[in-house]
Amino acid sequence: METQPDTSLMETRKSLDISEKTNSGCSVEAVYSGNFSVTVADDGETALVVSIVKGDESHMGPSDTNPLPVQAKMDGDPDSSHLKILCREENTEQVAVKSELNQSLPHDISSRLSSDSDQPFFAADIENRADPVVEKDCLSIDDKKNLSTAAISNSDVASVISLKRKHSDCSGDDGNSETKPEIYESLNELKLEEEEELTTVHHESRSPSNNTTVDIFSIVKGTGRRKNLMRSNPTDKSSEAENAAGLRVKKIKRTPEDEKESMVLVEKLRKEIREAVRNKSMEDIRENQFDPKLLAAFRAAVAGPKTGEAPRRSSALAVKAKKLMLQKGKVRENLTKKIYADLNGKRKSAWHRDCEVEFWKHRCIQGRKPEKIETLKSVLSLLKNKPADTKTNFSSETPQASNPILSRLYLADTSVFPRNDNLKPLLAPKEMGNSQNNGKPTEASKTLPKISAAKGSSVKAAGSKLNSGNKQSDGQPNLTSSNSKEMVENPDDLKKDKRKWALQVLARKKALAGNNSTQDKEGSPELKGNYPLLAQLPADMRPSLATSRHNKVPVAVRQTQLYRLTEHLLKKENLLTIRRSAATELAVADAINIEKAIADKSSSKVVYLNLCSQEILHHSESKTMDNAVEPNSSSPMADSESERISSKDSDNPAVLEALRAAGLADSPPNSPTRSVEVLPEKGDSSLDKTRETGPYNVFDMDSVPDTDIFGDFEYELDEEDYFGATMAKKASVMQPDESLTKVKVVLSTVQPGKSLNPSEVVEDEETTTENLNETTNGKEDGKSFVPMELVPEAEGEGEGEGEGEGEGEGGGEILSVAECEELYGPGTEKLVERPLIEGFAENGVKAKAPDSECESNTQREFIASNFEITCIQEKKLPRSIQKCKPSEKPSKEEKGKADGFGNSITKKVEAYIKEHIRPLCKSGVINVEQYRWAVTKTTEKVMKYHSKAKSANFLIKEGDKIKKLAEQYVETASSGAHHKDKCK
């Protein structure tokens, strides 16, 4: 029969599945539901593949009368046992005749078939080898049985994947056609003999006996039809031929002579090994259930040669086949087209290709392993020739049983030193001989305290290279230095010292941890400075943050507030000594719980700080805390009447200090002491008072030698309102700010004679005095006069009465630079007129911030400086004044309207800012002076950019920006970083 290595993946899988059921010798009843396929591989790797090509599916019903006897002949040992498939003895001539019969059978499925007719028996001869030997060295016992057991499978997919019947598969002698009747009669006789023993064999097939028999040809031929014992008519050949035509038999045999010899050698070696093991006495087996001799021999054999020989490479065929399996892409595609092509030239499906590769991969490639023979030879030689060595080796391994965990315990390789060898366990077998050096597990625990006691010196020593013995510090133990010397002397020991390296790395980490713990016990300087009571607590009692539902508050902020709460609760306890007690533990626990509740409720950092401060105020009972809460209990911004300061007390340093503490001074809180003007909040009422008592002439200020006007102005150098060199020359003090684009100018009118030429002033003194007397002269705190009505006289030059009235009704709108240049022309005249225009705008600007002392003071100083410049340019001033008419001056009602209009916008802005940061003041995060300073600065900054606004609608669009600006000023006030801005 022609040999073709063709099979299917399904057949291979089924052979494994069914063989698992029959590996104990049990027979399995064949119940088929449709097409089937049988794959049988015997002991010599000969495969019999049977599949249906054109079978009759209508006759594939289940049958209970088809026996499946399998006889498994067991040898003395289960390891050497192999199953023999008993086949009927038929000569080669009968097989050839049957092949010829199959060739002549018709393929028409529509031919007459009788359901009651007997089935012809188609037999395929399995070549009987004289000495079948199983190669069992690469398979387990069950796998060996599975390999030799008949595999039966019922599947409906076989008809889809099976190939068409080829005449070459069943080719035989064409001249033996006269022997067909004889073959058929012999088949029928055999069938009748089999059916007579139906009942007994059927029961045997279900019993799990070890001596059951299987007729492989009944599996191959059986279709599950009912057998009729009374009808054995040989005349109905068409149905028999049709049924036989549905079977395709392939015998695949690949058993080279070298493999047969290797299998015989393997079997011989195994028998010798068993005999050597059986010579052991029973006492040794009782002492140890595992055979120590065999175990040591197998260990030595599996480990391979101890010399530096290169490992034996696998065979070239195995490597080539493996590459072929793993190779993908075009190369594999072209190869498979050539290798797995059909007879018609078409390529087989991937299913068939993979099936064939899997079949031969498991049967042929793995079977040719000379390493197995070498392993068995080495085991046998160790058992026979070296019994003493195995005993000594085993005796050296027995101490591991007393402490087995150390032989399996590996230290993590976290060291920074290079690794020259693989990691070793703590208790390596080779280190057991000299237990004094390496073997004791207690040495690790002894070495760690010694190294950790060195603290900082051990860190330095571990940082240096360990293999240099001369770089040992004083704190390093003598053990480590001696070990390092040994490492230098014996380079081979470097590979075995991973454990000591790991110990030193652990010691370094432990030393660092010890330093941290001592610092915690002593208390960090930050805790001592800010939280003295908390610093006295033991380190394990200090509060730690509880987990919150969200992370909207930074951890650093939470930790600070937790310390603050704990410190406050410890103060509340009034303990003489801070130690571990019920009171301290309760205070710490309360602080942790309170902080966690606040953190869960808070949606932002500001809210969190507010709630923490409220909680501290709520728990406060001491007198100092009550005194601190009292100014917060009332409204943070008291009524303007209670905040008014009379001019009589303005020079008193005690009053100034009180005003500064209350936040009513112009300077920010906590600023250094200096002579500061204390200005009332509402400038209009103070102006009314000073008009009655102030001097009539502006130049009478010379009679008051101590009078001075201080103020800080920030001018952008690139702004159009910057006065330039004239202002800088006349300034008494000029101080640069942090940024290069700003200049801080302090204006003074103490000695106007220094800055003015007396001859220039006397020239037009009468005209100037007359015009100034007609205006409303303001005095602030009895120190300075401010001309209020010079602007309309200057405006009369170009615009007339309508311009003044329009500006009065419009809320004090400031003219732009372009308008000023149109009205008054470029050059030096602009220095005269523009300050007067902006001085007129003071009616609106000053009224916008009556509650902010800093802003009003700034504007008044601005007006005073304008008056000084007016005196400088006095020659040109009368020309513009002479052109003005008294009727063009705005009335007091118009000025009142402008004041009220600007005042309302400023009040709205200020109220908006107060509403945002008032909770911080009430809760104690910032005090009153910081609160007032932040409100003043924020309002001043906002109104600087919205000075022309006619309504407060810009708060809708820019509310968030204003809030952020206010928060920045609050942070500046609380940190004290703003002091340098105000210090001189």
From Swiss-Prot:
What domain of life does the native source organism fall in? Eukaryota
Q: What is this protein called?
A: Uncharacterized protein At4g10930
Q: Where is the composition biased (Polar residues)?
A: 466-485
Residue ranges of coiled coil: none
Q: Where is the composition biased (Basic and acidic residues)?
A: 486-496, 641-651, 679-692
Which organism is this protein's natural source?
Arabidopsis thaliana (Mouse-ear cress)
Q: Specify residue ranges for compositional bias: Low complexity.
A: 450-465
What are the boundaries of the region Disordered?
Answer: 422-496, 622-697, 755-786
